[in-house]
């Protein structure tokens, strides 16, 4: 695997803001991937199950850009924003592709993207900390976004995980005497998605895992000692 990266950092607004930019490219030869094949135990022409196998095949080329900034908007408020873009292309997947090309040579996956990696990602977080007599009232609102991914090398629609955005909100009081209490709402807008997807085959082309926890509201408290 060969990879190259270049970065740039600077500050602005008289040091109140920081900006980071990173660009990278890579090529990965003989990537290790899992492929599923049908199994006929009784040799009767009926598929009884499928089995996974690990192969080193093809080449993956990728390039991407990541940018982030942090801004102290005033003495109480800080804003963080980030954005990422990833473009990938896989070739030489004949040994694991179940889609035939024009001559039946299994090249229907040529040019596929790395299916488990979203093309676009983004995040934002707003923190507000307002001092009080014996502590501070702290508020945090954050959002993270991913574009669609999944579908295996073949791009099966059954295996796609759609784009989604998750938001969290926290409001609490932190005492100067080392204790705090906080109310929170995680997955504020009750978004649903999956952590990931197994690219199977045969009668079960997709298997999702890790369902997103629904909107969760609660209160937490804690104490620490110096």
Segments (PLM) and residue ranges:
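Membrane-embedded beta-barrel scaffold of Gram-negative outer-membrane proteins
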Residues: 1-57, 61-63, 72, 89-91
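Repeated loop/turn-to-beta-strand initiation elements of outer-membrane beta-barrel proteins
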Residues: 14-19, 76-79, 133-137, 177-181
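Short, glycine/charged-rich beta-strand-loop motifs at protein surfaces that mediate ligand recognition
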Residues: 22, 154-160, 168-172, 207
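C-terminal beta-signal and adjacent terminal beta-strands/loops
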Residues: 27, 34, 144-152, 173-226
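Gram-negative outer-membrane beta-barrel transporters
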Residues: 25-27, 49-153, 222-224
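Short, P/G- and charge-enriched loop/turn segments at secondary-structure junctions
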Residues: 7, 54, 110-112, 156-157, ...
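Flexible, surface-exposed loop regions and adjacent strand-edge segments
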Residues: 35-44, 50, 86, 92-105, ...
């Amino acid at each position: 695997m060969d990879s190259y990266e270049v970065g740039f950092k600077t500050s602005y607004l008289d040091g109140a803001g920081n900006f980071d930019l990173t660009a990278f490219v890579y090529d990965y030869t003989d990537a290790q991937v899992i492929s599923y094949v049908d199994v006929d135990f009784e040799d009767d022409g009926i598929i009884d199950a499928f089995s996974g196998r690990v192969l080193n095949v093809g080449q993956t080329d990728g390039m991407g850009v990541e940018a982030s900034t942090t801004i102290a908007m005033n003495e109480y408020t800080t804003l963080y924003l980030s954005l990422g873009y990833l473009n990938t292309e896989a070739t030489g997947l004949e040994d694991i592709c179940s889609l035939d090309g024009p001559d039946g040579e299994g090249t229907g996956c040529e040019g596929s993207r790395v299916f488990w990696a979203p093309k676009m990602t983004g995040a934002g977080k707003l923190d507000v900390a307002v001092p009080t007599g014996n502590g501070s009232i702290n508020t945090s609102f954050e959002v993270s976004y991913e574009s669609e991914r999944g579908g295996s090398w073949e791009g099966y629609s059954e295996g796609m995980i759609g784009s989604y955005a998750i938001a969290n909100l926290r409001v609490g009081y932190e005492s100067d005497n080392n204790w705090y209490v906080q109310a929170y709402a995680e997955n504020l807008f009750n978004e649903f998605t999956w952590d990931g997807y197994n690219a199977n085959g045969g009668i079960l082309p997709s298997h999702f895992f890790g369902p997103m926890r629904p909107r969760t509201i609660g209160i937490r408290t804690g104490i620490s000692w110096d």
